[in-house]
Amino acid sequence: MLISARRLRRCQSLQLLASCFVLSLMALLVQEDNSLVNHVKSYSYRYLINSYNFVNDSLSVPRDRSDGAAGYRYLINNRHKCLNEDVLLLLFVKTAPENRRRRNAIRKTWGNEDYIRSRYAANIKVVFALGVERDPVKSHHTQQDLVNENKRFKDLIQQDFSDTFHNLTLKLLLQFGWVNSFCPSAKFIMSADDDIFVHTPNLVTYLKSLPIETQDFWIGRVHRGSPPIRSKASKYYVPYEMYPWSSYPDYTAGAAYVVSRDVAAKVYEASQTLNTSLYIDDVFMGICANKMGVVPQYHVYFSGEGKSPYHPCIYNKMMTSHGHLGDLDYLWRQATDSNVKSLSSGFLGNVYCKIVNIMLLCKIGYVDTYPCSAAWS
């Protein structure tokens, strides 16, 4: 009994010493602009951010003072896109006015509604969300091009805010406001950048497998305990007066994520009483969701910043891949080839693809797209 008591006191002493060491180290480095230190501090802080309401309270504004997207008028609006239809997935593509080539490439590949309807018996709707050309010299000509483009494809949603990086939160509010007003019956809503490849067949198959009344659903590449960037040289710079806390609430990368319709409604509701000056849209999305008690779920095949490895064993499970401009057509043909499924089918196929995926995703220093854990899923 005496030995046990001594061991207990020794363990307690070691824990106390370790805690003092960590606290002392953090105190010494607190003034350092060190990325690793900032991440350690912010990740330690994330429990408070995710569990309590002081962040939401500090960013809240009265509803009548909200400066959201409701104050901007629609210049182009396809309000009947979802009318009287049972929509499985409403897919918003965030785009810029000048990116017509990207939009055309998406329409022919992963955003092809007719292809998904005929091959997978699923009704998806793809719309492009954008603001207005920021260059006044080009604005009139560009706007006329957009009007003509929409006459042909009927898939643009545009409001009259300037289409800039610092207005991405307005583009987020445009999306969720449009869902709330014109497509509230869509079961799932996706937001994606226009340089993303979305494996819509895999995504649709996955969404169809979920329970009919799936709720509180939010999947993507989750960032946990991310610190605000305080360097003015970064385009992600956020000053203390805009966001004073050491960590953001958990959120999914804005490049691509999917939510259920109840989450879309909750985010829209929360956005009506939050200060929208925080221009990093995926962080603002996390703040809205946190206010409503919605937690993001990490999906290993939603990509990070880099491109997915080009291999059939990856295509079989991929959901998104980032950074695709000139290769969408090639990747679409490769990823949807009928031989992809047959290659990984059966016991030997599963073993083969498991080995290949481990070799592709578990290399030391490889952090571009999917985590090593994806190889084992």
Swiss-Prot record:
Family from the record? Belongs to the glycosyltransferase 31 family.
Q: Which GO terms describe its biological process?
A: protein O-linked glycosylation
List the subcellular locations: Golgi apparatus membrane
Write out the topological domains of type Lumenal.
31-377
Q: Which organism is it from?
A: Xenopus laevis (African clawed frog)
Q: What PANTHER family does the database record attribute to this sequence?
A: BETA-1,3-N-ACETYLGLUCOSAMINYLTRANSFERASE (PTHR11214), LACTOSYLCERAMIDE 1,3-N-ACETYL-BETA-D-GLUCOSAMINYLTRANSFERASE (PTHR11214:SF21)
**Top-level enzyme category:** transferase
Q: Where are the transmembrane segments?
A: 14-30
Recorded hits in Pfam families, A to Z, give: Galactosyl_T
Chain positions carrying an annotated carbohydrate: N56, N167, N275
For this entry, the protein name equals Lactosylceramide 1,3-N-acetyl-beta-D-glucosaminyltransferase B
The Gene Ontology terms for molecular function here are:
glycosyltransferase activity; lactosylceramide 1,3-N-acetyl-beta-D-glucosaminyltransferase activity
